[in-house]
UniProtKB/Swiss-Prot annotation:
Belongs to the peptidase M24A family. Methionine aminopeptidase eukaryotic type 2 subfamily. Substrate binds at H199, H307. SUPFAM superfamilies: Creatinase/aminopeptidase, Winged helix' DNA-binding domain. This is Methionine aminopeptidase 2-1. It comes from Aspergillus fumigatus (strain ATCC MYA-4609 / CBS 101355 / FGSC A1100 / Af293). One of its GO terms (biological process) is proteolysis. Induction: Expression is controlled by the fumagillin biosynthesis cluster regulator fumR. Expression is also under the control of the developmental and secondary metabolism regulator veA. The gene is af410.
Length: 446
Protein backbone atom coordinates (compact mmCIF):
# COMPACT_ATOMS: atom_id res chain seq x y z
CA UNK A 1 0.00 0.00 0.00
CA UNK A 2 1.40 3.41 -1.05
CA UNK A 3 0.86 6.66 0.90
CA UNK A 4 1.51 10.18 -0.50
CA UNK A 5 3.07 11.80 2.56
CA UNK A 6 3.36 15.44 1.31
CA UNK A 7 -0.31 15.55 0.24
CA UNK A 8 -1.43 14.24 3.63
CA UNK A 9 0.70 16.76 5.47
CA UNK A 10 -0.77 19.64 3.45
CA UNK A 11 -4.33 18.53 4.23
CA UNK A 12 -3.54 18.27 7.91
CA UNK A 13 -2.13 21.79 8.03
CA UNK A 14 -5.32 23.17 6.47
CA UNK A 15 -7.82 21.27 8.60
CA UNK A 16 -6.18 21.24 12.00
CA UNK A 17 -2.93 22.69 13.28
CA UNK A 18 -3.56 21.12 16.71
CA UNK A 19 -2.20 18.07 18.44
CA UNK A 20 -4.29 15.58 16.53
CA UNK A 21 -2.91 16.83 13.23
CA UNK A 22 0.66 16.67 14.45
CA UNK A 23 0.19 13.19 15.79
CA UNK A 24 -1.44 11.94 12.60
CA UNK A 25 1.24 13.51 10.43
CA UNK A 26 3.89 11.68 12.41
CA UNK A 27 2.17 8.31 12.22
CA UNK A 28 1.24 8.52 8.55
CA UNK A 29 4.74 9.65 7.62
CA UNK A 30 6.12 6.67 9.49
CA UNK A 31 3.74 4.40 7.65
CA UNK A 32 4.90 5.86 4.37
CA UNK A 33 8.52 4.83 4.78
CA UNK A 34 7.83 1.64 6.71
CA UNK A 35 10.49 2.38 9.33
CA UNK A 36 8.64 4.09 12.16
CA UNK A 37 10.60 7.33 11.41
CA UNK A 38 9.24 10.57 9.93
CA UNK A 39 9.88 11.20 6.23
CA UNK A 40 11.06 14.40 4.52
CA UNK A 41 8.18 15.89 2.48
CA UNK A 42 10.62 17.38 -0.02
CA UNK A 43 9.84 21.07 0.82
CA UNK A 44 12.13 23.75 2.21
CA UNK A 45 9.84 24.14 5.20
CA UNK A 46 11.87 23.96 8.42
CA UNK A 47 8.78 23.39 10.53
CA UNK A 48 8.52 26.96 11.92
CA UNK A 49 4.96 27.35 10.60
CA UNK A 50 3.76 24.80 13.20
CA UNK A 51 2.81 26.43 16.50
CA UNK A 52 5.20 25.67 19.42
CA UNK A 53 2.40 23.90 21.28
CA UNK A 54 1.97 21.46 18.42
CA UNK A 55 5.68 20.73 18.26
CA UNK A 56 5.83 20.23 22.03
CA UNK A 57 2.82 17.97 22.01
CA UNK A 58 4.25 16.06 19.04
CA UNK A 59 7.52 15.62 20.96
CA UNK A 60 5.62 14.39 24.03
CA UNK A 61 3.69 11.91 21.89
CA UNK A 62 6.94 10.59 20.47
CA UNK A 63 8.41 10.20 23.95
CA UNK A 64 5.32 8.37 25.18
CA UNK A 65 5.42 6.15 22.14
CA UNK A 66 9.08 5.37 22.73
CA UNK A 67 8.37 4.46 26.35
CA UNK A 68 5.96 1.78 25.22
CA UNK A 69 8.61 0.03 23.17
CA UNK A 70 10.07 -2.87 25.06
CA UNK A 71 13.63 -3.83 24.24
CA UNK A 72 13.99 -7.23 22.64
CA UNK A 73 15.05 -9.93 25.01
CA UNK A 74 18.64 -10.88 24.31
CA UNK A 75 19.41 -14.54 23.89
CA UNK A 76 21.71 -15.87 26.63
CA UNK A 77 25.29 -16.22 25.45
CA UNK A 78 26.80 -18.09 28.39
CA UNK A 79 25.75 -21.42 29.87
CA UNK A 80 24.58 -21.54 33.48
CA UNK A 81 26.09 -23.62 36.27
CA UNK A 82 24.67 -26.26 36.44
CA UNK A 83 23.89 -26.28 32.71
CA UNK A 84 20.24 -25.46 32.05
CA UNK A 85 20.00 -23.30 28.90
CA UNK A 86 18.94 -25.29 25.81
CA UNK A 87 21.68 -25.50 23.22
CA UNK A 88 19.24 -24.27 20.58
CA UNK A 89 19.46 -20.86 22.29
CA UNK A 90 23.25 -20.88 22.43
CA UNK A 91 23.57 -22.13 18.83
CA UNK A 92 20.51 -20.53 17.14
CA UNK A 93 21.50 -21.65 13.63
CA UNK A 94 21.88 -25.28 14.74
CA UNK A 95 25.56 -24.98 13.89
CA UNK A 96 27.01 -27.12 16.67
CA UNK A 97 30.75 -27.65 17.21
CA UNK A 98 32.41 -30.44 15.28
CA UNK A 99 34.22 -33.22 17.04
CA UNK A 100 37.87 -33.96 16.42
CA UNK A 101 38.31 -34.66 12.70
CA UNK A 102 41.09 -37.11 11.83
CA UNK A 103 42.18 -37.95 8.29
CA UNK A 104 42.19 -41.58 7.27
CA UNK A 105 45.52 -43.32 6.75
CA UNK A 106 47.18 -45.36 4.04
CA UNK A 107 44.89 -46.54 1.21
CA UNK A 108 41.98 -44.46 2.55
CA UNK A 109 43.90 -41.19 2.56
CA UNK A 110 42.28 -40.21 -0.77
CA UNK A 111 38.92 -39.83 0.98
CA UNK A 112 39.89 -36.47 2.46
CA UNK A 113 39.97 -34.76 -0.95
CA UNK A 114 37.61 -36.98 -2.98
CA UNK A 115 34.76 -34.92 -4.48
CA UNK A 116 32.51 -37.98 -4.47
CA UNK A 117 33.11 -38.57 -0.76
CA UNK A 118 32.60 -34.89 0.00
CA UNK A 119 29.23 -35.07 -1.73
CA UNK A 120 28.25 -38.07 0.38
CA UNK A 121 29.37 -36.21 3.49
CA UNK A 122 27.16 -33.24 2.59
CA UNK A 123 24.13 -35.51 2.32
CA UNK A 124 24.51 -36.31 6.02
CA UNK A 125 23.85 -32.78 7.32
CA UNK A 126 20.87 -33.69 9.54
CA UNK A 127 22.67 -36.77 10.85
CA UNK A 128 25.74 -34.71 11.74
CA UNK A 129 23.71 -31.89 13.28
CA UNK A 130 21.89 -34.32 15.59
CA UNK A 131 25.11 -36.03 16.61
CA UNK A 132 26.97 -32.77 17.20
CA UNK A 133 24.14 -31.36 19.31
CA UNK A 134 24.09 -34.51 21.45
CA UNK A 135 27.89 -34.40 21.72
CA UNK A 136 27.94 -30.74 22.80
CA UNK A 137 25.30 -31.49 25.43
CA UNK A 138 27.46 -34.40 26.60
CA UNK A 139 30.58 -32.23 26.89
CA UNK A 140 28.85 -29.47 28.84
CA UNK A 141 27.11 -31.86 31.22
CA UNK A 142 30.10 -34.08 31.91
CA UNK A 143 32.49 -31.17 32.42
CA UNK A 144 30.08 -29.72 34.96
CA UNK A 145 29.91 -33.17 36.60
CA UNK A 146 33.70 -33.45 36.75
CA UNK A 147 33.89 -30.10 38.55
CA UNK A 148 31.13 -30.88 41.01
CA UNK A 149 31.18 -34.60 41.86
CA UNK A 150 32.71 -34.90 45.33
CA UNK A 151 32.97 -37.53 48.07
CA UNK A 152 29.98 -37.30 50.39
CA UNK A 153 27.40 -37.04 47.62
CA UNK A 154 24.88 -39.83 47.09
CA UNK A 155 24.80 -41.62 43.76
CA UNK A 156 21.18 -40.53 43.40
CA UNK A 157 22.18 -36.86 43.70
CA UNK A 158 24.87 -37.32 41.07
CA UNK A 159 22.66 -39.22 38.61
CA UNK A 160 19.72 -36.84 38.94
CA UNK A 161 21.94 -33.79 38.49
CA UNK A 162 23.53 -35.16 35.32
CA UNK A 163 20.24 -36.25 33.79
CA UNK A 164 18.34 -33.07 34.64
CA UNK A 165 21.00 -30.96 32.95
CA UNK A 166 21.15 -33.23 29.91
CA UNK A 167 17.41 -32.96 29.37
CA UNK A 168 17.55 -29.17 29.75
CA UNK A 169 20.29 -28.83 27.14
CA UNK A 170 18.47 -30.86 24.48
CA UNK A 171 15.20 -29.10 25.31
CA UNK A 172 13.09 -32.15 26.15
CA UNK A 173 12.22 -33.13 29.71
CA UNK A 174 10.64 -36.45 28.73
CA UNK A 175 7.58 -35.93 30.92
CA UNK A 176 5.02 -35.96 28.12
CA UNK A 177 4.36 -39.06 26.06
CA UNK A 178 6.97 -39.52 23.34
CA UNK A 179 9.01 -36.46 24.30
CA UNK A 180 12.05 -38.46 25.36
CA UNK A 181 12.12 -40.07 21.89
CA UNK A 182 12.75 -36.68 20.29
CA UNK A 183 15.83 -36.06 22.44
CA UNK A 184 17.02 -36.96 25.92
CA UNK A 185 18.95 -39.67 27.71
CA UNK A 186 20.49 -42.35 25.50
CA UNK A 187 20.61 -44.77 28.43
CA UNK A 188 20.57 -44.56 32.24
CA UNK A 189 23.62 -42.81 33.68
CA UNK A 190 26.08 -45.44 34.84
CA UNK A 191 27.73 -44.75 38.21
CA UNK A 192 29.93 -47.76 38.81
CA UNK A 193 32.13 -47.87 41.90
CA UNK A 194 35.39 -49.82 42.34
CA UNK A 195 34.90 -53.45 41.22
CA UNK A 196 31.49 -52.76 39.65
CA UNK A 197 32.45 -52.48 36.01
CA UNK A 198 29.25 -51.33 34.28
CA UNK A 199 25.43 -51.26 34.15
CA UNK A 200 24.76 -49.86 37.60
CA UNK A 201 22.52 -46.82 38.01
CA UNK A 202 20.95 -46.00 41.37
CA UNK A 203 17.32 -47.01 41.79
CA UNK A 204 14.97 -44.88 43.88
CA UNK A 205 15.89 -45.11 47.55
CA UNK A 206 19.57 -45.92 46.92
CA UNK A 207 21.60 -44.69 49.91
CA UNK A 208 25.09 -45.27 48.49
CA UNK A 209 27.44 -42.36 49.24
CA UNK A 210 30.59 -41.70 47.23
CA UNK A 211 33.71 -42.12 49.39
CA UNK A 212 37.17 -40.57 49.18
CA UNK A 213 38.81 -43.91 48.36
CA UNK A 214 36.34 -44.89 45.62
CA UNK A 215 37.05 -45.15 41.89
CA UNK A 216 33.93 -43.92 40.08
CA UNK A 217 33.16 -44.68 36.43
CA UNK A 218 30.64 -42.23 34.94
CA UNK A 219 28.99 -43.47 31.74
CA UNK A 220 26.62 -40.97 30.09
CA UNK A 221 24.48 -41.38 26.98
CA UNK A 222 22.61 -38.49 25.33
CA UNK A 223 20.63 -38.68 22.11
CA UNK A 224 19.04 -36.29 19.64
CA UNK A 225 16.71 -37.90 17.12
CA UNK A 226 17.90 -41.35 18.18
CA UNK A 227 21.57 -40.51 17.48
CA UNK A 228 23.21 -41.63 20.71
CA UNK A 229 26.52 -40.22 21.95
CA UNK A 230 28.05 -42.74 24.34
CA UNK A 231 31.07 -41.50 26.28
CA UNK A 232 32.50 -42.29 29.70
CA UNK A 233 35.23 -41.21 32.09
CA UNK A 234 36.61 -42.29 35.47
CA UNK A 235 37.16 -40.18 38.58
CA UNK A 236 39.37 -40.98 41.56
CA UNK A 237 40.12 -38.76 44.54
CA UNK A 238 43.34 -40.47 45.65
CA UNK A 239 46.46 -40.24 43.44
CA UNK A 240 47.33 -43.90 44.09
CA UNK A 241 44.83 -44.78 41.33
CA UNK A 242 46.39 -42.45 38.75
CA UNK A 243 48.16 -45.20 36.80
CA UNK A 244 44.97 -47.24 36.54
CA UNK A 245 43.17 -44.28 34.99
CA UNK A 246 46.14 -43.45 32.75
CA UNK A 247 46.27 -47.02 31.41
CA UNK A 248 42.63 -47.06 30.41
CA UNK A 249 42.67 -43.57 28.92
CA UNK A 250 45.73 -44.52 26.86
CA UNK A 251 44.04 -47.72 25.68
CA UNK A 252 40.90 -45.86 24.62
CA UNK A 253 42.88 -43.19 22.79
CA UNK A 254 44.86 -45.94 21.07
CA UNK A 255 41.63 -47.58 19.92
CA UNK A 256 40.29 -44.25 18.67
CA UNK A 257 43.55 -43.48 16.85
CA UNK A 258 43.82 -46.87 15.11
CA UNK A 259 40.12 -47.22 14.24
CA UNK A 260 39.05 -46.46 10.68
CA UNK A 261 37.44 -47.72 7.51
CA UNK A 262 38.63 -51.25 6.56
CA UNK A 263 40.31 -51.82 9.95
CA UNK A 264 39.69 -55.34 11.30
CA UNK A 265 38.29 -55.29 14.81
CA UNK A 266 40.37 -58.26 16.04
CA UNK A 267 43.55 -56.45 15.09
CA UNK A 268 42.30 -53.25 16.72
CA UNK A 269 41.75 -55.19 19.95
CA UNK A 270 45.44 -56.10 19.91
CA UNK A 271 46.49 -52.45 19.82
CA UNK A 272 44.15 -51.70 22.73
CA UNK A 273 45.46 -54.59 24.82
CA UNK A 274 49.09 -53.68 24.19
CA UNK A 275 48.53 -50.10 25.38
CA UNK A 276 46.49 -51.12 28.42
CA UNK A 277 48.73 -53.89 29.70
CA UNK A 278 51.92 -51.87 29.48
CA UNK A 279 50.89 -50.23 32.79
CA UNK A 280 50.94 -51.29 36.40
CA UNK A 281 49.54 -49.59 39.47
CA UNK A 282 50.73 -49.56 43.08
CA UNK A 283 47.86 -49.50 45.57
CA UNK A 284 48.58 -49.49 49.31
CA UNK A 285 52.07 -50.86 48.80
CA UNK A 286 51.13 -53.66 46.38
CA UNK A 287 51.79 -53.50 42.63
CA UNK A 288 49.08 -54.71 40.25
CA UNK A 289 49.41 -55.25 36.50
CA UNK A 290 46.55 -53.56 34.66
CA UNK A 291 44.52 -56.08 32.69
CA UNK A 292 42.05 -55.45 29.90
CA UNK A 293 38.64 -56.91 30.75
CA UNK A 294 38.49 -59.47 27.99
CA UNK A 295 34.82 -60.45 28.04
CA UNK A 296 33.64 -56.88 27.34
CA UNK A 297 33.67 -55.08 23.99
CA UNK A 298 33.16 -51.75 22.34
CA UNK A 299 30.30 -51.73 19.84
CA UNK A 300 28.53 -50.04 16.98
CA UNK A 301 25.62 -47.71 17.73
CA UNK A 302 22.42 -47.75 15.68
CA UNK A 303 19.50 -45.27 15.69
CA UNK A 304 17.62 -45.68 18.99
CA UNK A 305 19.79 -48.70 19.84
CA UNK A 306 22.94 -48.44 21.93
CA UNK A 307 24.35 -51.82 20.87
CA UNK A 308 24.69 -52.56 17.17
CA UNK A 309 25.90 -55.71 15.42
CA UNK A 310 29.68 -55.17 15.43
CA UNK A 311 31.97 -55.43 18.46
CA UNK A 312 35.46 -54.16 19.23
CA UNK A 313 37.31 -56.46 21.67
CA UNK A 314 39.83 -55.13 24.18
CA UNK A 315 42.26 -57.94 23.39
CA UNK A 316 43.71 -59.33 20.17
CA UNK A 317 41.41 -61.82 18.45
CA UNK A 318 40.82 -63.56 15.14
CA UNK A 319 37.69 -61.52 14.42
CA UNK A 320 38.07 -60.40 10.80
CA UNK A 321 35.04 -58.07 10.83
CA UNK A 322 35.88 -54.78 9.13
CA UNK A 323 34.89 -51.29 10.13
CA UNK A 324 32.99 -49.66 7.27
CA UNK A 325 32.08 -46.24 5.94
CA UNK A 326 29.06 -44.91 7.80
CA UNK A 327 29.62 -46.98 10.94
CA UNK A 328 29.24 -45.30 14.33
CA UNK A 329 31.38 -46.94 17.02
CA UNK A 330 31.60 -46.59 20.77
CA UNK A 331 35.31 -47.16 21.36
CA UNK A 332 35.49 -47.99 25.06
CA UNK A 333 37.98 -49.84 27.20
CA UNK A 334 37.89 -51.19 30.74
CA UNK A 335 40.97 -51.96 32.79
CA UNK A 336 41.20 -53.87 36.06
CA UNK A 337 43.58 -54.66 38.90
CA UNK A 338 41.85 -58.05 39.14
CA UNK A 339 41.41 -61.06 36.87
CA UNK A 340 40.34 -59.18 33.75
CA UNK A 341 36.89 -60.80 33.65
CA UNK A 342 33.46 -59.82 34.92
CA UNK A 343 30.44 -61.74 36.16
CA UNK A 344 26.83 -60.53 36.32
CA UNK A 345 25.13 -59.94 39.66
CA UNK A 346 23.34 -57.46 41.88
CA UNK A 347 20.20 -55.34 41.79
CA UNK A 348 19.10 -54.61 38.22
CA UNK A 349 18.55 -51.02 37.13
CA UNK A 350 19.04 -51.13 33.32
CA UNK A 351 16.36 -52.44 30.94
CA UNK A 352 15.59 -52.16 27.22
CA UNK A 353 12.78 -53.20 24.93
CA UNK A 354 14.01 -55.88 22.55
CA UNK A 355 13.61 -54.86 18.94
CA UNK A 356 13.37 -58.47 17.78
CA UNK A 357 11.03 -59.70 20.52
CA UNK A 358 7.98 -61.78 19.63
CA UNK A 359 4.99 -59.63 20.60
CA UNK A 360 3.07 -62.50 22.17
CA UNK A 361 -0.25 -62.08 23.98
CA UNK A 362 0.32 -60.98 27.56
CA UNK A 363 -2.05 -62.36 30.16
CA UNK A 364 -0.93 -59.98 32.93
CA UNK A 365 -2.76 -56.66 32.60
CA UNK A 366 -0.06 -54.67 34.43
CA UNK A 367 2.50 -56.01 31.95
CA UNK A 368 0.35 -54.93 28.99
CA UNK A 369 -0.07 -51.37 30.24
CA UNK A 370 3.61 -51.11 31.17
CA UNK A 371 4.66 -52.36 27.73
CA UNK A 372 2.54 -49.66 26.10
CA UNK A 373 4.21 -46.99 28.26
CA UNK A 374 7.68 -48.33 27.44
CA UNK A 375 6.99 -48.34 23.69
CA UNK A 376 5.61 -44.80 23.68
CA UNK A 377 8.27 -43.26 25.91
CA UNK A 378 11.49 -45.20 25.27
CA UNK A 379 11.03 -47.57 22.33
CA UNK A 380 14.36 -49.47 22.15
CA UNK A 381 16.35 -46.86 24.12
CA UNK A 382 17.52 -48.33 27.45
CA UNK A 383 15.72 -47.08 30.55
CA UNK A 384 15.84 -47.61 34.30
CA UNK A 385 13.32 -47.77 37.11
CA UNK A 386 13.81 -44.10 37.93
CA UNK A 387 12.66 -43.23 34.40
CA UNK A 388 9.47 -45.24 34.92
CA UNK A 389 8.93 -43.34 38.17
CA UNK A 390 9.32 -40.00 36.33
CA UNK A 391 6.56 -40.75 33.82
CA UNK A 392 4.14 -41.71 36.58
CA UNK A 393 4.29 -45.50 36.48
CA UNK A 394 3.42 -47.10 39.82
CA UNK A 395 3.63 -50.64 41.19
CA UNK A 396 5.22 -51.76 37.95
CA UNK A 397 7.85 -54.22 39.23
CA UNK A 398 5.67 -57.32 38.80
CA UNK A 399 4.77 -56.32 35.25
CA UNK A 400 8.39 -55.43 34.45
CA UNK A 401 9.67 -58.81 35.65
CA UNK A 402 6.93 -60.50 33.62
CA UNK A 403 8.09 -58.68 30.46
CA UNK A 404 11.67 -59.77 31.15
CA UNK A 405 10.65 -63.41 31.62
CA UNK A 406 8.57 -63.22 28.43
CA UNK A 407 11.65 -62.12 26.46
CA UNK A 408 10.09 -58.80 25.46
CA UNK A 409 12.28 -56.63 27.70
CA UNK A 410 15.97 -57.34 28.29
CA UNK A 411 17.43 -56.73 31.74
CA UNK A 412 21.08 -55.79 32.20
CA UNK A 413 22.41 -56.71 35.65
CA UNK A 414 25.54 -54.98 36.96
CA UNK A 415 28.87 -56.39 35.73
CA UNK A 416 31.33 -57.09 38.54
CA UNK A 417 35.02 -57.87 38.90
CA UNK A 418 36.27 -59.65 42.02
CA UNK A 419 35.52 -57.82 45.30
CA UNK A 420 38.47 -55.73 46.44
CA UNK A 421 39.63 -54.94 42.90
CA UNK A 422 39.43 -51.63 41.06
CA UNK A 423 38.29 -50.94 37.52
CA UNK A 424 38.32 -47.91 35.23
CA UNK A 425 36.65 -46.93 31.96
CA UNK A 426 37.09 -44.34 29.22
CA UNK A 427 34.99 -44.17 26.08
CA UNK A 428 34.40 -42.09 22.95
CA UNK A 429 31.90 -42.19 20.10
CA UNK A 430 33.40 -42.00 16.62
CA UNK A 431 31.74 -41.47 13.23
CA UNK A 432 33.39 -43.08 10.21
CA UNK A 433 32.34 -40.39 7.76
CA UNK A 434 33.09 -40.75 4.03
CA UNK A 435 35.87 -38.14 4.19
CA UNK A 436 37.25 -38.24 7.75
CA UNK A 437 36.93 -39.96 11.09
CA UNK A 438 35.14 -37.67 13.54
CA UNK A 439 35.66 -38.28 17.25
CA UNK A 440 32.30 -36.72 17.96
CA UNK A 441 32.57 -36.79 21.78
CA UNK A 442 36.12 -35.43 22.05
CA UNK A 443 36.55 -32.51 24.45
CA UNK A 444 39.20 -30.56 26.32
CA UNK A 445 38.76 -32.94 29.26
CA UNK A 446 39.53 -36.23 27.49
Amino acid sequence: MTVDAPELLEKLRITDAGANGADMSSSTSAAANGTGKEVDDGSDDDGTENPPAVAAEHSTAKKKKNKKRKPKKKQPKVQTDPPSIPLSQLFPNNSYPKGEEVEYKDENRYRTTSEEKRHLDNLNSDFLSDYRQAAEAHRQVRQWAQRNIKPGQTLLEIANGIEESARCLVGHDGLTEGDSLIAGMGFPTGLNIDNIVAHYSPNAGCKTVLAQNNVLKVDIGIHVGGRIVDSAFTMAFDPMYDNLLAAVKDATNTGVREAGIDVRVGELGGYIQEAMESYECEIRGKTYPIKAIRNLCGHTILPYSIHGTKNVPFVKSNDMTKMEEGDVFAIETFGSTGSGRYVEGGEVSHYALRGDADRKDLTLSSARSLLTAIKKNFSTIPFCRRYLDRIGQEKYLLGLNYLVKSGIVEDYPPLNEKPGTYTAQFEHTILLRPTVKEVISRGDDY
